């Protein structure tokens, strides 16, 4: 395997913001399965926690926080299975462009929540691979991670 040639002296640290385990297999899953990477999965939608733990057979640390700018926001809760819960109100016209997505983006509840900045998360340290899937809030998340921004080796939005 090509990873054997890398001769890593420590595990790769993967952080996934918006880690809801829905339809697709994350690109880093095999690294976690092979115990080459440690995964920190961050998803503020507490309904997602058990499916994240199940997907990784407990080889994951889950942080149930919404990451943004550290301020209060409206949270637009959509069906758990859709993974579309967001700090941004879904635009039904835009979602209709994608076949069936207007159903996924249907808001079932709105509530006020407090967010945290990426920089305020303790015990994460440097990040080798950052994946962010936050329904349009990706730039806001990265912008509020100034202390960590230059510690990313790879990031994927």
Regions found by a protein language model. Give the residues of each.
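Phosphate/nucleotide-binding beta-alpha loop and adjacent structural elements of enzyme active sites
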Residues: 1-157
């Amino acid at each position: 395997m090509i990873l054997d040639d890398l001769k890593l002296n420590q595990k790769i640290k993967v952080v996934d913001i918006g880690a809801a385990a829905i339809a697709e297999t994350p690109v880093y899953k095999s690294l976690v399965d092979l115990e080459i990477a440690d995964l920190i999965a961050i998803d503020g939608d507490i309904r997602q926690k058990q499916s994240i733990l199940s997907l990784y057979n407990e080889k994951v640390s889950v942080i149930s926080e919404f990451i943004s700018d550290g301020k209060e926001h409206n949270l637009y809760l959509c069906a758990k299975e859709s993974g579309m819960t967001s700090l941004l109100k879904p635009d039904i016209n835009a979602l209709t462009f994608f076949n069936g997505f207007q159903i996924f983006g249907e808001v079932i509840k709105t509530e006020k929540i407090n967010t945290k900045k990426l920089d305020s998360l303790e015990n994460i340290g440097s990040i080798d691979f950052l994946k962010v899937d936050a329904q349009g809030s990706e730039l806001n998340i990265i912008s509020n991670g100034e202390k960590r921004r230059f510690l990313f080796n790879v990031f994927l939005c």
